[in-house]
Regions:
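Short amphipathic alpha-helical segments that mediate assembly, nucleic-acid/protein binding
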Residues: 3, 7, 68, 94-97, ...
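Residue-level preference for nonpolar/small residues embedded in alpha-helices
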Residues: 35-36, 67, 142, 167, ...
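N-terminal accessory segments that target, anchor, or regulate ATP-driven/P-loop NTPase machines
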Residues: 1, 45-46, 64, 75-81, ...
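DNA strand-break repair and replication-stress modules
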Residues: 1-100
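AAA+ P-loop NTPase catalytic core and its hallmark functional loops
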Residues: 96-378, 405, 410-415
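C-terminal helical "lid" subdomain and adjoining coupling/linker elements of P-loop NTPases
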Residues: 375-452
Length: 452
């Protein structure tokens, strides 16, 4: 039993707590009703913290005021700061609210950037279903904003970030919204200049036995320059640097190109072919630390006028994605004093929304995913699959696959929690080797209350 003296000592420790934890710290929110919990997490987000429903890995705890002596003592023992709502209510000024996305017949606004929308023509465009799973959170819309600025200013734009942070999707989505045709080329270590600018290929339509058995195939870049398409070069730094340097004149302002591989046809000002007004070029890549990546020359990097390095998602972003999939609700976020949120979309898995246990399950899935992703190669080092030459990878795609399976199993009449365990077994557990690695994943499941 906690004595009155212990209670007073604990209270004095709390009262002398000093400054708030650093921005970006994970804060465990506990002891509140659901309505109070939502209000508390909102205040934490406005103040720059990362709220979580789980104690594991938290730097601080947010509790009702006054906090109990047990909470204070436990937090002091773990080196965890104790916070109450009053610390944030006074400082949190209600930000101005704006819709994160606005589409009219002739324009698209992404955050604070408005770009032109082409006349209606569905030919060559990606279908809307391609983007049904998108969660319009701060990271994704910031990337899309960079793409929109590049499109408006006719500047080459590169997006760099970890696997599955929606780099390519951001470019293709903006192109889709603008009714702009985009062509995508996945580069690799075997890519050559022929894929980019053109090469001679067999002329299969020519009369058999004719000496003119070859024709010049125009590569993806000059073809896009001629017809006004957007070019998306995926995995840019997997290609050899000398191959990429062939694009240097295309990245200049204004863009140009000489097809020396053929007849010397010149694209650009004063040339044989005018570059179409709507031509744009984009690139995506993983950081150079990834295996097999080339180090790009400073001169080549400098030619990409806009270069955006994207943040990797954390528990907050994964949880928002799950909410989007099940409820169709996009998250609110604050940038530069403005609170943004996109209008609700059709949920991808509406059959899950009616189960009263779903929100608690989504909390657990998000925390579990973050735990295994970090163990497989987070900032603190690899603890899962340490002896393997090829590390395990758990990304947004992993979670999307698990949720798709979960929804399908529930449709077949399987109980929600049983379906969740089955989906996780198939997508996560079977991905790792039996033995210590699989035991570690099961342990992560038990930590969030899902395992047996």
């Amino acid at each position: 039993m906690i004595t009155a003296a212990m209670n007073q000592a604990a209270r004095e420790t709390y009262d002398s707590g000093g400054d708030l934890p650093a921005k970006g710290s994970r804060v465990w929110v506990t002891g509140f009703t659901r309505e109070e919990y939502d209000a508390g997490t909102r205040l934490l987000e406005l103040a720059g913290f990362l709220p979580t429903a789980f104690a594991t890995g938290a730097d601080a705890v947010l509790v009702p005021d006054p906090p109990t002596a047990a909470i204070i003592e436990d937090s002091e023992r773990l080196g965890r700061k104790v916070l109450v709502l009053g610390m944030f209510r006074d400082a949190a000024k209600p930000p101005r609210r704006r819709a994160a996305l606005e589409i009219t017949e002739h324009s698209v606004r992404i955050l604070d950037v408005t770009i032109e929308r082409r006349s209606a023509d569905s030919s060559g465009l990606l279908p809307a279903e391609r983007f049904a799973h998108l969660c319009l959170d701060a990271t994704f819309l910031t990337a899309a904003r960079s793409v929109a600025i590049a499109a408006h200013s006719r500047l080459p734009c590169a997006l760099e970030g970890d696997t599955a942070v929606t780099k390519t999707t951001a470019v293709l989505w903006v192109a889709h919204l603008c009714r702009q045709e985009a062509v995508r080329l996945n580069l690799n270590g075997q890519s050559d200049t022929g894929e980019l600018v053109g090469r001679f290929v067999p002329n299969l339509n020519h009369a058999q036995g004719s000496p003119a058995a070859w024709r010049f195939w125009e590569g993806i870049v000059p073809d896009a320059m001629r017809h006004g398409r957007w070019v998306v070069l995926d995995e840019l730094n997997l290609a050899e640097p000398q191959v990429l340097e062939r694009l240097n004149p295309v990245l200049e302002q204004p863009p140009s190109l000489v097809l020396s591989e053929h007849t010397g046809e010149r694209f650009g000002l004063g040339g044989d072919v005018a570059v179409a007004e709507s031509f744009r070029i984009f690139a995506t890549m993983n950081p150079a630390e990834y295996a097999g990546r080339s180090v790009l020359s400073p001169a080549f990097r400098d030619r990409w006028s806009l270069w955006s390095v994207l943040e990797s998602p954390g528990e907050k972003e994964y949880r928002a994605l799950l909410t989007r999939l099940v409820h169709g609700v996009h998250p609110q976020f604050v940038l530069d004093g403005v609170e943004w949120r996109a209008a609700d979309s059709s949920p991808v898995h509406p059959n899950l929304a009616s189960d009263g246990r779903i929100d608690g399950l989504l909390d657990a899935i998000a925390s579990f995913h973050v735990a295994v992703a970090a163990a497989a190669g987070g900032d603190s080092g690899v603890t899962l699959g340490r002896a393997r030459r090829e590390r395990y990878v758990f990304t947004r795609r992993t979670m999307l696959a698990a949720m798709s399976l979960l929804a399908g199993l529930v449709d077949r009449g399987i109980d929600l929690e049983a379906a969740a365990l089955e989906a996780i077994e198939l997508v996560y557990l079977q991905r790792v080797q039996p033995g210590p690695d699989r035991q570690a994943v099961r342990s992560a499941l038990r930590t969030v209350g899902l395992g047996r």
